[in-house]
Amino acid sequence: MLIVGPTAVGKSDVGIAVARRFNGEIISGDSMQVYRGMDIGTAKLKQEERGGILHHMIDILDPDEPFSVADFQRRVTTLIPEIVNRGRLPILVGGTGLYVQSIIDHYEFTEEATDLELRSQLEQEADASGLEALHRRLAEVDPISAARIHVNDRKRIIRALEVYRLTGRRQSDFHYADSVRQPKYQLAPIALTMDRQELYRRIDLRARNMIESGLVEEVKGLLKGGYAPTLPSMQAIGYKEIVGYLQGEYDLARALYLLQRDTRHFAKRQYTWFRRDTRLIWFAADAMDRERLMEGIFDVVSNALGGHVERNINDGGAFR
């Protein structure tokens, strides 16, 4: 089972409802929720908000530990059969398109793998720190590529770092083209959407609530804990904006504005990514009441998985 869509659309609540109905376990497809101590800025559900449903791929790493989409794929492809063998339905819920697609299409990663969000982050790092700093960072992880790429070749420096962060492998190690295997799993592929202005209203409200709930204190704690602001995790949306505020670059009102703006831009990119996948069955979360929405989604799961899933309302039905 797959539940995707833009940030703030309500994926987590739908995932919990599906897990309750079909005796499922949730696998987070969010690239940032893997990090411990990064809770508010990643909109991570608290334990008491998870409805008693087992959630995986949350709080498994410290913020300074590297984690690529290839790492995610390796962990989740091991996790899925374990869940199935327990008689439960694996439910992949998330908005990080490349992470999700690496599972459902069983990507074999090579240097052609790409992630526009990561590339945008590297572009910002180049603007903030300069190309020489980025080139030195490349030399630390891939000295062969660094030797081949001129210190002023912005595009190639960023691309080499992008490949390394995505795949966990050096660009210089690749000698063949990217390939995508046939889908590995039988899917019930759900995507959530809503009116764009309503989504943006929810995004803006959530950003404000994050700050009111202690996001600034969370980021302060991470910095005091020794996590550098240049870490990939600390450059994520929700953290880089607060880091700028704490470093005196702007006031808190500006930080909130940037957080809201950057999250809206991210939602646009998520829409662009998921709209390319014609397998997804879209539901407008704001166009019907909750009961009708969930019944429609439950029907898709039952029809898509057929005899492999047993719908249950009262007696804890299982994935077969």
UniProtKB/Swiss-Prot annotation:
Region (Interaction with substrate tRNA): 30-33
Site-annotated residues for Interaction with substrate tRNA: T96, R119
Residues reported to bind ATP: G5, P6, T7, A8, V9, G10, K11, S12
Single GO MF descriptor: ATP binding
SUPFAM superfamilies assigned to the protein according to its UniProt record, in alphabetical order: P-loop containing nucleoside triphosphate hydrolases
Positions contributing to substrate binding: T7, A8, V9, G10, K11, S12
EC numbers: 2.5.1.75
Domain of life: Bacteria
Function: Catalyzes the transfer of a dimethylallyl group onto the adenine at position 37 in tRNAs that read codons beginning with uridine, leading to the formation of N6-(dimethylallyl)adenosine (i(6)A).
Complexes and interactors: Monomer.
Family the UniProt entry places it in: Belongs to the IPP transferase family.
Full protein name: tRNA dimethylallyltransferase
Species whose genome carries this gene: Heliobacterium modesticaldum (strain ATCC 51547 / Ice1)
Lineage, broadest ranks: Bacteria, Bacillati, Bacillota, Clostridia, Eubacteriales
